[in-house]
């Protein structure tokens, strides 16, 4: 299945060169959110997405770089983030040189983690897309019970929004359409189930080591 093209960032100096020459900065590309053009020559990316319950325990998590290479480091990071954010009304936090946007839904906390230079609005668009896609998929409130019963679908949703850390989609309608298409493919469904089982194994291993 062909994936949508991720939003590229402009090359360094793309706008500055035009300004120095006396001309206007280049216009935003079609489909690119206004005001979100950063100067790093890379794609819009995130470091991690995770969902915790209201006790700070991991339910779903995917990390896209080696900032936290081990399960132990990831779990410590998640616990620290939860302790910092679970009792505040804000939707954004800065922690350990990273930008974190988050949302509370009943007994769940959803987090999207980006670099310190990543645009907050872009991170928030990923978080909103994830929440609205899960809400549509579950057809109920986004809460722990329903998430656990539909974990394979939750992994499919996340994989349509982010691939290898690169943001692919921020429209929940498009995400749901693609998830429904992939759900008809037995191989991909088995892959998502395998992700759930692997996540469960890692959590059990970590709990035994504590």
Swiss-Prot record:
Biological process according to GO: intra-Golgi vesicle-mediated transport; intracellular protein transport; retrograde vesicle-mediated transport, Golgi to endoplasmic reticulum
InterPro entries: AP_mu_sigma_su (IPR022775), Coatomer_zeta (IPR039652), Longin-like_dom_sf (IPR011012)
Gene3D superfamilies: 3.30.450.60
Region (Disordered) residue spans: 1-34
CDD domains linked to this entry: Zeta-COP
Keywords: Cytoplasm, Cytoplasmic vesicle, ER-Golgi transport, Golgi apparatus, Membrane, Protein transport, Transport
Pfam families registered for this protein in UniProt: Clat_adaptor_s
Cellular component, GO annotation: cis-Golgi network; COPI vesicle coat; cytosol; endoplasmic reticulum membrane; endoplasmic reticulum-Golgi intermediate compartment membrane; Golgi membrane; transport vesicle
Topological category with respect to the lipid bilayer: Peripheral membrane protein
Predominant subcellular localization, coarse grouping: cytoplasm
Biased composition regions of type Basic and acidic residues, renumbered to the chain: 1-12
Compartment(s) of residence: Cytoplasm; Endoplasmic reticulum-Golgi intermediate compartment membrane; Golgi apparatus membrane; Cytoplasmic vesicle, COPI-coated vesicle membrane
Function: The coatomer is a cytosolic protein complex that binds to dilysine motifs and reversibly associates with Golgi non-clathrin-coated vesicles, which further mediate biosynthetic protein transport from the ER, via the Golgi up to the trans Golgi network. Coatomer complex is required for budding from Golgi membranes, and is essential for the retrograde Golgi-to-ER transport of dilysine-tagged proteins. The zeta subunit may be involved in regulating the coat assembly and, hence, the rate of biosynthetic protein transport due to its association-dissociation properties with the coatomer complex.
Assembly and interaction partners: Oligomeric complex.
Protein name in the entry: Coatomer subunit zeta-2
Organism: Homo sapiens (Human)
Species classification: Eukaryota, Metazoa, Chordata, Craniata, Vertebrata
Protein's gene: COPZ2
């Amino acid at each position: 299945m062909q994936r949508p093209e991720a939003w590229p960032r402009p090359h360094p100096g793309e706008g500055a060169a035009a300004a120095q020459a006396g001309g206007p900065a280049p216009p935003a590309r079609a489909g690119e959110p206004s005001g979100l053009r950063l100067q790093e020559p890379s794609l819009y990316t995130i470091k991690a997405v995770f969902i915790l319950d209201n006790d700070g325990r991991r339910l779903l998590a995917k990390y896209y770089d080696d900032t936290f290479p081990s399960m132990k480091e990831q779990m410590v990071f998640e616990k620290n983030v939860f302790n910092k954010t679970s009792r505040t009304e804000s939707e954004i936090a800065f922690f350990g040189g990273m930008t974190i946007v988050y949302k509370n839904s009943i007994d769940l906390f959803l987090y999207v983690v980006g670099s310190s230079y990543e645009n907050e609005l872009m991170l928030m668009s990923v978080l909103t897309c994830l929440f609205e896609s899960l809400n549509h998929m579950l057809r109920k409130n986004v809460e722990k019970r329903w998430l656990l019963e539909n974990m394979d679908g939750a992994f499919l949703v996340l994989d349509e929004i982010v691939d290898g850390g690169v943001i692919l989609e921020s429209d929940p309608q498009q995400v749901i359409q693609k998830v429904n298409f992939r759900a008809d493919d037995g191989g991909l469904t088995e892959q998502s189930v395998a992700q759930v089982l692997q996540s469960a194994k890692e959590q059990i291993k970590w709990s035994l080591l504590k």
